[in-house]
Structure formats: structure tokens, C-alpha cells
Design a protein with these regions (language model features):
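Alpha-helical transmembrane bundles and membrane-interface segments of multipass inner-membrane proteins
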Residues: 1-191
Length: 191
């Protein structure tokens, strides 16, 4: 396994570690622990950075693999979906946004499965990357702002995060629609 693929797998491994610290932060309760929120944010930042780094190293060193094309977007989905599930549980993100994100990810996974049947590997497109970056920035804003905000800033952090979540939902619909349209031939060829 090459280094970019190891970085992708590290991102997958960091997901449960991130979730433990996110849960221990207990956002939205009287027991909120900003230290755990900050640690969760740092872990998420490191995991997000591996997304940039693995792609950069793979392209720069000609280490692009089918495994990487498949696992990199899957690792992103694991990381961002886990974070959004927790934000919904805390009441920060609308369940509608999470449903849109999950629907898009399952639809894209279905297209990838259809493509695999024909021996085609579909790499992530630019719009999917924009969506992923926006989702990651939203999560990073939430954890760092929640950890660093004073008691009077909590409401503002929540409102800004909710707005960013809706923006993520819109970007998710756009990227999913473009992805499905670009790969519509696969539906026509499906048996």
C-alpha cells in the first residue's frame, strides 16, 4: 500500500477517534467541555488535511490507484457524515440537511457500483470536492468556534453553523445532480 492510500486509511481510522471526543464535548448541555470540542476539531482538521495530502502526493508522485480513487471519497464520506450526524444530534444541523447528504452519498455509491460492473472507475469530480471542502470547513468552524466562544457567543455560533449547514445541503444537491447527470449513460446501459 502506497503512502497516499495509507493516509486515506488513516482518515478512516480517525473517524471513531473524532467521534469519541465530539461526544465527550457534550455540546448543547450544561456539561459542555470546550477542551474536548477543541480536541475533536483538531482531530477533524488533521483528518481533513490528509484528504488534501493524499491526493497531492498521489498526483505528484504518479501514485494514483483504483483503490485510492474508490477509498478517498469513501473516507471523506465517513468523516463528514459522522460529523454531521453528531451535529444533528446536538440540534445544530437540520435533519433535512443530513438526509440530503446521505441521499446524495447513497446515490453516488449506486452509480459507482453500476460503473464497477462495466469495469469503469469513476473518480471524484470538482463539484464533489467543492462540496466536501465546504462540509469540512463547516465542521471545523463549528468545533473551533464552539470551543473558543464565550457563553454569550454560543447562540451566534449556532446560527452561523446552521446557515453553513444549509449551504452544505445546497452544495450537496448541486454536486449530486451534476454527478448523476454526467454519469446518466450508466443508467441507460444497466441491465
Amino acid at each position: 500500500m502506497n503512502l497516499p492510500n495509507k493516509l486515506t486509511m488513516l482518515r478512516v481510522i480517525l473517524v471513531p477517534v473524532f467521534m469519541v471526543f465530539a461526544a465527550c464535548s457534550r455540546y448543547g448541555t450544561a456539561d459542555f467541555n470546550p477542551t474536548f470540542a477543541l480536541i475533536a476539531g483538531i482531530i477533524f482538521a488533521v483528518a481533513s488535511f490528509t484528504d488534501f495530502l493524499d491526493g497531492y502526493l498521489a498526483r505528484k508522485n504518479n501514485l494514483v490507484t483504483d483503490f485510492g480513487k474508490f477509498m478517498d471519497p469513501l473516507a471523506d464520506k465517513c468523516l463528514t457524515t459522522a460529523a454531521f450526524i453528531y451535529m444533528v444530534a446536538c440540534g445544530i444541523c437540520s435533519p433535512v440537511v443530513l438526509a440530503v447528504i446521505l441521499f446524495r452519498e447513497f446515490a453516488v455509491a449506486g452509480v459507482r457500483m453500476l460503473a464497477a460492473e462495466t469495469g469503469t472507475v469513476i473518480a471524484a469530480n470538482m463539484w464533489g470536492k467543492v462540496k466536501t471542502v465546504l462540509q469540512m470547513l463547516t465542521v471545523l468552524f463549528y468545533y473551533f468556534a464552539a470551543a473558543l466562544a464565550g457563553p454569550t457567543d454560543v447562540m451566534a455560533v449556532g446560527l452561523i453553523t446552521q446557515l453553513l449547514c444549509w449551504l452544505c445541503g445546497a452544495a450537496t444537491v448541486l454536486s449530486g445532480g451534476i454527478y448523476l447527470w454526467q454519469n446518466r449513460k450508466l443508467f441507460m446501459q444497466a441491465k
